[in-house]
Structure formats: structure tokens, C-alpha cells
């Protein structure tokens, strides 16, 4: 995501209509969690609205531990997190991915680690995934933070590779057909570069870039770079915060 003088990501979420209760899943670019001053109490109020949140730009585990501690002390739920096994990025900048979630909502949680590239440099930050089970709904959740780069060409190349990410995790657990891909893609989801991901896997994006912007700059809503890709046949509702 291109940053201006002041920039944050809007948190996007989906709610799955399950029996006997719904679960809400969100994606959030935390803007260097652990490396700068954060109002963790305010952040926890936002995060606590959801059951499972995929986090990008986690700089270290210290920030996650602090967020978890505040959530546990200010909500009625017990919270836990998974952090990616390695930091990803360039030699000058690296970050972790993480999931933070309400323990009572999930009976099974397992890290599937970072995507293993077929060819070197498919992604500047290889996506990270985990498998979750909530009541009768089990799924793989993949989170991503695409390159911004010096030109749009870099972003297009990465976007065209997300079909391979989907296939990688699908092949890793062949019996799992519920796979969610979310994050900060630095391109709108209706870009042609995402067509292979959408068409080959019967997916749709939940935020229409034509109507909704998801990135805030010092000048207001700037672009629609954050999104969630999900099976077209799933029942869900969408919200922006």
C-alpha cells in the first residue's frame, strides 16, 4: 500500500452464517505493529469485534503479546495468536504475518506456514496461512501483503501469482475446499491480474473496488487495495470499519 503523510488501512471483515452461531473474520494492516507507538486499548476495541483477524505488518512478537494481553484484560474472551515462522520482505525491511483469535470460537487451529515459492522472487513477502475449525466449518485462511514497488508492473506480477498460492494450499490439504485469501494487495481486486485466481477457483471478491475505498491517506479515502477473496457459493455478509 502506498503511504502518504498519514495512512492507515480500513479493517474489512466477513461474517459467515453458520449454525448455531456466526463467526466473523477480518483482515487488517497494522502499520508496523510492535515498532511504533500504538494505542493498544483503542486497537483492542476494534479487534474485539471479530472472532479471527489476519494481521499484516507485524514487526515483532512483542506487539502481538501486548495486543493479546490487552484483549484478555478488557474483553470476556480468551485470545490467542499464531505468528508466521519467519519474517518476509527485502533485505532492508521485513515483517511477520499473524492471526489473532478468540479461543472459544475455534476447536482446531494449525499453522500451514508461508507459501513455498515455485520460482524465486514470486513474492517479496510470501503469503502465510493457517487452518481453522469452528463448529462444522473448517477452512484455510491465507493472508497476503503484496509489493507496492516502483511501478505497477511489480504489483501486477504478484497479483497474477495468487492463483499458484491458492493451488499450493489446496494441494497441501486436498480434502479442504474452503479457502479464503485476504490482505493488502496494493491493487484493486477487479484488476485483470487477479483473473486467474478468480476464474480458476470459483472465487469472488467481497469488496467492490468501484464503490468502496479501503485505504485512508491525509487527503481522505485513497484506493481500494484491501480485499477478501472467497468461494462464490458461500453465504456471508461484509462490513468495513
Give names to the regions the model predicted:
Residues 4-16:
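Sec-dependent N-terminal signal peptides
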Residues 21-24, 48-52, 76-80, 105-107, ...:
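Loop/turn elements at helix/coil->beta-strand transitions in domains of secreted/extracellular proteins
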Residues 22-32, 110-112, 138-148:
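Active-site-proximal beta-strand elements of phosphoester/diester hydrolases
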Residues 23-30, 46-67, 100, 141, ...:
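Active-site beta-strand/loop signature of hydrolases that rely on acidic residues for catalysis
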Residues 27-38, 117-120, 149-154:
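Acidic/histidine-rich helix-loop elements
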Residues 54-55, 82-85, 179-184, 205-210:
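Active-site neighborhood of phospho(di)ester-bond hydrolases with catalytic His/Asp-centered motifs
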Residues 59-137:
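Structured beta-strand-rich core segments of catalytic domains in phosphoester-bond hydrolases
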Residues 61, 167-177, 187-241:
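Metal-dependent phosphoester-hydrolase catalytic domains
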Amino acid at each position: 500500500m502506498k503511504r502518504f503523510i498519514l495512512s492507515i488501512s480500513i479493517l474489512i471483515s466477513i461474517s459467515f452464517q453458520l449454525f448455531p452461531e456466526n463467526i466473523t473474520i477480518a483482515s487488517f494492516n497494522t502499520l508496523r505493529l510492535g515498532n511504533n507507538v500504538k494505542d493498544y486499548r483503542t486497537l483492542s476495541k476494534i479487534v474485539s469485534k471479530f472472532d479471527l483477524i489476519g494481521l499484516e505488518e507485524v514487526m515483532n512478537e512483542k506487539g502481538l503479546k501486548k495486543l493479546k494481553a490487552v484483549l484478555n484484560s478488557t474483553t470476556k474472551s480468551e485470545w490467542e495468536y499464531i505468528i508466521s515462522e519467519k519474517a518476509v520482505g527485502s533485505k532492508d525491511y521485513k515483517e511477520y504475518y499473524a492471526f489473532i483469535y478468540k479461543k472459544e470460537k475455534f476447536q482446531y487451529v494449525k499453522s500451514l506456514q508461508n507459501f513455498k515459492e515455485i520460482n524465486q522472487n514470486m513474492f517479496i513477502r510470501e503469503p502465510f496461512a493457517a487452518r481453522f475449525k469452528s463448529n462444522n466449518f473448517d477452512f484455510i485462511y491465507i493472508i497476503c501483503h503484496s509489493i507496492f514497488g516502483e511501478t505497477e508492473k511489480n504489483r501486477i506480477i504478484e497479483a497474477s501469482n495468487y492463483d499458484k498460492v491458492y493451488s499450493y494450499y489446496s494441494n497441501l490439504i486436498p480434502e479442504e475446499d474452503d479457502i479464503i485469501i485476504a490482505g493488502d494487495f496494493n491493487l484493486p481486486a477487479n484488476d485483470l491480474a487477479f483473473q486467474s485466481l478468480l476464474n480458476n477457483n470459483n472465487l469472488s471478491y467481497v469488496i467492490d473496488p468501484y464503490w468502496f475505498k479501503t485505504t485512508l491517506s491525509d487527503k481522505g479515502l485513497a484506493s481500494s487495495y484491501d480485499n477478501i477473496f472467497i468461494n462464490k457459493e458461500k453465504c456471508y455478509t461484509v462490513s468495513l470499519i
